[in-house]
Amino acid sequence: MSDPLALAQALLRCPSVTPLDAGAQSVLAEALTAQGFTVTQLPFGDIANFYAKRVGPRSGPHLCFAGHTDVVPPGDAPWSVDAFAGEVHDGVLIGRGACDMKGAIASFVAACAARPDHPGTISLLITGDEEGVATDGTVRVLDWMRQAGEIPDFCVVGEPTNPGRLGEVIKIGRRGSLNATLTVRGRQGHVAYPHRADNPLPRLVAALHALTTTRLDDGMEGFEPSSLQLTTVDVGNPATNVIPEQAQARLNIRFNPLHRGDDLARWLRGIVQDHAPDAVIDIAISGEAFVTDPDRDPRPGASHGIAALRMAIQRITGLSPRLDTGGGTSDARFITHLCPVVEFGLVGATMHQRDEAVAVRDLQDLTGIYEALLDFYLGKDSA
C-alpha cells in the first residue's frame, strides 16, 4: 500500500481558503503527472480546477474521483497548532482540510500509485470552488467533460461521510436546498398613531405561519420528510415606540426527491402572496434532491459501483456500510447529471472545526479501501 501521509501534509500546508489555491493544485497535479496521468488545467474566473486521466493497458470501466482542494477559513478560535502546518501529533494529522477533504484526495492518489497497471480508466475531477459559491468549479468542469466526451461510468466524491468510524456510511444521495428571502414593506410611524402608519409585520407573520404549519410530505424510502426552517426574522428596529417600515425573513427548505426546486418555489410564492401581496420574494435553489439507488438507478455503473465500494469497505474495515442520504449538499448534486455518483471519505467529526484532524491510520485504511475499489470496479477482482 502506498502511504498518503506526505501528500496529505503537503496539501495541508497550502492555505487554500476559497477562492485561493495557494499552490495546492500544483502539488496535486505534480503527483499525478509523476504517475502517468494527463492533467488538463481548467481555470474559470479566479478558480483553479483540473481534470486528470490515466488509461490502463486493458479495456474496462471509467471510474472518476471528485474532490476539492479549497477549505473554509480556520476561524477566530485559537488552534492547538498552526492550522496550515500539517503537523502529526500522537498519530493524528491536524490541519484545515485534514478530513474535508485533502486527506481523502491524498488517499485516492496513493491508491492510484499502488495500481499502475489497472484495467479501464481512472480520472480525477478537482475543483477549488466547493466551499464557496460553486459557480466556477465542478459545474464548469462538468460542462467541459460533456463537450470533450469524458463521461465516467461511476464517480466517488471524497467527502467525509462517516460520523464516527471509517466505513460506517456511503452517501448515495442528498436532499435539495432552497433559500428564500421575504421582504414586506410598509410605512414607518409612531405606535400611538397606527392609522398614520402601515405595519408590515402582521402580513409577514401571517405568511410565515402559513409556511411553517404546512407539512410538505411524509418522507420517502431513504429520505426524511422535507423541512422548512426559518433562519432570520428582522425589522432593524430597536425602538419600542416605532412601527417599522420594513420586515424581512429568511428561510431554507431541505427537500427530498418528492419535490423539484421550481415547484417548491411556486408553492412558496403562492402562500406568501396570499398573505402579503406586496412582498418581494427572492429565491435561490442551490441544488436538487437526488439519489443513486443501487436497485432502481437504470445506469449500469450505479449498482456495480456501489457493490464494489461496499466490498472494498468490508475488506479493509470489516464493516458493512449503510447507505444514507442525510447531511448537507455537496458537488455530487451536480455530478449526478453526468453519471452515477456516491460519496465516501474520512470521518467528518471535526470538519470545519478548530483543530480539524484525521487519524493517520484512517488515511492509510482509506487508501486501502480506494485500492480495493479500483480492483473490484475496474476488473482486477470481480464484484
Swiss-Prot record:
Reaction catalysed? N-succinyl-(2S,6S)-2,6-diaminopimelate + H2O = (2S,6S)-2,6-diaminopimelate + succinate
Which InterPro entries does the record associate with it?
Bact_exopeptidase_dim_dom, DapE_proteobac, Peptidase_M20, Peptidase_M20_dimer, Peptidase_M20A
Cofactor annotation: Zn(2+); Co(2+)
**Catalytic residues in the record:** D70, E130
Which positions bind Zn(2+) 2?
A: D100, E131, H352
What are its GO biological-process terms?
A: diaminopimelate biosynthetic process; L-arginine biosynthetic process; lysine biosynthetic process via diaminopimelate
Amino-acid positions noted as binding Zn(2+) 1 in the UniProt annotation, renumbered to this chain: H68, D100, E159
Free-text remark on how the cofactor is bound: Binds 2 Zn(2+) or Co(2+) ions per subunit.
Q: Which UniProt keywords apply?
A: Amino-acid biosynthesis, Cobalt, Diaminopimelate biosynthesis, Hydrolase, Lysine biosynthesis, Metal-binding, Zinc
| Pathway assignment | Amino-acid biosynthesis; L-lysine biosynthesis via DAP pathway; LL-2,6-diaminopimelate from (S)-tetrahydrodipicolinate (succinylase route): step 3/3
GO MF terms here are: acetylornithine deacetylase activity; cobalt ion binding; succinyl-diaminopimelate desuccinylase activity; zinc ion binding
Stated EC number for the protein is 3.5.1.18
The family classification in the record reads: Belongs to the peptidase M20A family. DapE subfamily.
On assembly, the entry states: Homodimer.
- Role this protein plays: Catalyzes the hydrolysis of N-succinyl-L,L-diaminopimelic acid (SDAP), forming succinate and LL-2,6-diaminopimelate (DAP), an intermediate involved in the bacterial biosynthesis of lysine and meso-diaminopimelic acid, an essential component of bacterial cell walls.
Which protein, by its recorded name, is this? Answer: Succinyl-diaminopimelate desuccinylase
